[in-house]
Amino acid sequence: PPRSTLFPYTTLFRSHSVSVTGDVVTFTGNKALQQEEALIFELDNPGAVGVDLPEPVTTKTRLGGLSPRASVGLPQLAEPDVVRHYTRLSQNNFAIDTTMYPLGSCTMKHNPRLNEKMARLPGFGDIHPMQPVETVQGALELIDQLAHWLKTLTGMPAVAMSPGAGAHGELCGLMAIHAALDARGESHRRRVLVPESAHGTNPATAAFCGFTVDTIPAEENGRVSVEAVKAKLGDDVACIMLTNPNTCGLFEPQIREIADAVHAAGGYFYCDGANYNAIVGRVRPADLGVDAMHINLHKTFSTPHGGGGPGSGPVVLSDALAPFAPLPFVVHGKDGFDLIEHAKDAGKAQPFGRLKGFHGQMGMFVRALAYILSHGADGLRQVSSDAVLNANYILASLKDVMSASFEGPCMHEALFDDRFLKGTGVTPLDFAKAMIDEGYHPMTMYFPLVVHGALLIEPTETESKRTLDQFIGTMRHLAEKAKAGDLAHFQAAPRLTPRKRLDETQAARKPVLRWVKPATPATVGVAQAAE
């Protein structure tokens, strides 16, 4: 029957326990509350209102004299119904605030509540980007301080603060490289070298900027060799885009030699900073020969991801690329802080002006600086150390029941492949779906592409040993269950979610973005009579 004929929601309570080192640990994960919820349109209660305001005296004062020709079709509900509806929906979400979030290459760390308190201070939370600069001196000083920290940590002389996320930062860096090459009179350099293990945004960004992508194969050890890079170099190479540590969770030991070879050939070195959390406070990208690198504040510096976002991806730049940084930027003069917003005031080459309508993600700037100041330099070094330690603890604890993709230790994330599932009939997707019933968001699947059936786990530094042991116990339990031949268990997973396995291909290719009110018997009769 249509969901509108059912109760608005149904609640099921479940719990789960796992055995960890001989002790039974009660672990509810994200399974404590599961429910079916009607659409907000299906909860429509004609005549209900949230706030009752006086009607305007004349129609001319309403919508500037305009009047709608037909009802918009928005549902009518009282405020408690709206609050309860969206609260119930939120309880079906998985979030870092509920359980460990092992999504590889995403650095899903805890978002400290102190950062949230700072971001809500009136001097930061209640300002507007179009205010006169003399009224937002504190905000401009904060941007300047954060920029100083990012330059100091990376060893880079300049930073563009406005990019809105990681891929947006890539776009900023590639546009700066494009402009620098044009200024050198070398517009023929339009080939970008990208390792096959790179994030998919790297080749996409290069292509979007008008470059041709040339793929560098990975070595058997998961790394990029300087010999493979040299074989691709030529006078048409614009840059190389390299992630370090790479998406296999491994440090690139020849990165300086690679940078020197690219520079000698006339190209630039763009470093994808997605995995900067593994080296923050310990490695300065400038010392590796980097010309441009985006920094994901929503990863390394703990600002919220996704729906809790937005993201923020400042880009640090070398001396060679600094003149091509986008507007705006903050300067400190004798009269305080000022915001340079126009090319005529910049005194630099500004070939593409702005990347965003305003000045960057101010709320994320506040949170990131609060995080940095809370930790200090020593604390940030501890962050990277603990992130690497936690990943290696998982790798060492699971490699006897799951198949590690490479020999030796990892950096910030542990990479496994599907060899341990061979002969079981269980796929990496089945394994990941079964994790949901155990209270965990799945790890990253089938990425990086250089590993068959990849399962990429990144615990970050904020998880305790107890939490890691619970996760390890669950992974061992599932691996042993798969090897024991319980194929039906995996193919039926997840069982405990309101929705089971969705047709993700159809959802992506044929999304239903508009709710259509179901036909009533009366309207059906009218339509039949018209026919």
Question: Residue ranges of each PLM-predicted region?
Answer:
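Long, K/E/R/D-enriched contiguous segments that form extended
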Residues: 144-148, 154-157, 162-173, 177
